Amino acid sequence: MSWATRPPFLPPRHAAGQCGPVGVRKEMHCGVASRWRRRRPWLDPAAAAAAAGEQQALEPEPGEAGRDGMGDSGRDSRSPDSSSPNPLSQGIRPSSPPGPPLTPSAPPPPMPPPPLGSPFPVISSSMGSPGLPPPAPPGFSGPVSSPQINSTVSLPGGGSGPPEDVKPPVLGVRGLHCPPPPGGPGAGKRLCAICGDRSSGKHYGVYSCEGCKGFFKRTIRKDLTYSCRDNKDCTVDKRQRNRCQYCRYQKCLATGMKREAVQEERQRGKDKDGDGDGAGGAPEEMPVDRILEAELAVEQKSDQGVEGPGATGGGGSSPNDPVTNICQAADKQLFTLVEWAKRIPHFSSLPLDDQVILLRAGWNELLIASFSHRSIDVRDGILLATGLHVHRNSAHSAGVGAIFDRVLTELVSKMRDMRMDKTELGCLRAIILFNPDAKGLSNPGEVEILREKVYASLETYCKQKYPEQQGRFAKLLLRLPALRSIGLKCLEHLFFFKLIGDTPIDTFLMEMLEAPHQLA
């Protein structure tokens, strides 16, 4: 080939001989051709074999690779070095002779890297995490063989090394949420000394959970005794603490729980409530004889207020309609209702505002229970406190037949069948009076305690007075939902009559009807 003819890869000035003597042009020509073959190794198999041999000779030992790459940050692994072994000295002969030797004054430029770009985007796309190489399979210790990673990779310190020296960054340096150490903030939680559950604090001198605290408290307050079915060495832990009460109680005492601490707490509660005589919940605190006295006293006042002409009259003895008669009787009964409440034990000890709230919340149910029990001996009608009888037919003609029938079937008939006495009636009314759900109470808990005392007194009375009737106490309590439902329905009727203005409603009853709206 003539050098006068321009090769396709040389610029025009090389072909025209503008680059100096012929020897220099030949040297440059060989250098460019060599670089061209090295850049395109697949065009020249001999050059590809020589490049592979040179790359193998340049790879340092595993111990020296990291030291050379990290220690000398300014050295390029592709540049010739005096310490690098010569591929010819190791017996690796290229298939084609290399080009003429280059003069020291004009060294060839370093070999450019293959046109692959950075390998990290490829790894990022396959792993979903930037900068992390693909994980090696278990038991694999050799170099990473990937068609994308076939050149040296620059290390973070500025040095370079072969792909075997690239270590994945340590996970958890940034953004990795590690679990707290064993000695962290959550390690100081105390456990229950009895069952090992999580402790809620120190109770009766020992760190314990709420379950063991309540168990010990109930045992002391109710003076309970237990027995063990086994050898009194049962396991008491979080799962089996309810299996043997005897062993659980003995473990409470063994760990240091104090009986006197429960008694002192109980005494402080009684002093706070102003109720220091007797045991909490005992029937003696709500004697049924005083409740009976309250019922009898109110009944005598009602009998004294009955007028002579209407005392024995029938359903049509009064010129007024049944609704008017009921409203007038209710208005008179409200005055005696206050006297009755004052005679109920512990009611007067409540704050005055709470007394008013309780009366306003239950006056309708209290009056319905009273005239329903009074009407036990009346057939198909009710007997009012004024002495007037209201017959079923009169109620239907006045438009209140549905609610009137409910009073007769759900209250009067049931009271008649079980022969409810006045003591039981008084206890039911006391339960209605002590309503802890009334809105605006300053201390609902105290009212609830009083209601529980009435429950206990009524149950004891039923067992002593009617021992053959095991379910009498339950039957009495079943009348309370009926009283509640009928009382709400009667309020709807009274509000309706008040709005239309056809029925005269006296002052006290009017105040009671308006009270819920004022309190709300």
From Swiss-Prot:
Q: Bias regions of kind Pro residues — which residues?
A: 95-118, 131-140
InterPro entries listed in its UniProt record: NHR-like_dom_sf, Nucl_hrmn_rcpt_lig-bd, Nuclear_hormone_rcpt_NR2, Nuclear_hrmn_rcpt, Retinoid-X_rcpt/HNF4, Znf_hrmn_rcpt, Znf_NHR/GATA
**Pfam families attached to this UniProt entry:** Hormone_recep, zf-C4
Q: Where are the zinc fingers (NR C4-type)?
A: 192-212, 228-252
Can you provide one Gene Ontology molecular function annotated for this UniProt record?
A: nuclear steroid receptor activity
Q: Where is the composition biased (Low complexity)?
A: 119-130
What's the domain remark here?
A: Composed of three domains: a modulating N-terminal domain, a DNA-binding domain and a C-terminal ligand-binding domain.
Q: How does it assemble?
A: Homodimer (in vitro). Heterodimer with other retinoic acid receptor family members. Binds DNA preferentially as a RAR/RXR heterodimer. Interacts with NR1H3. Interacts with AKAP13.
Family membership noted in the UniProt record = Belongs to the nuclear hormone receptor family. NR2 subfamily.
Query: Which protein is depicted?
Result: Retinoic acid receptor RXR-beta
Q: What organism, scientifically named, is this protein from? A: Mus musculus
Question: What does the record give as the organism's lineage?
Answer: Eukaryota, Metazoa, Chordata, Craniata, Vertebrata
Which gene underlies this protein? Rxrb
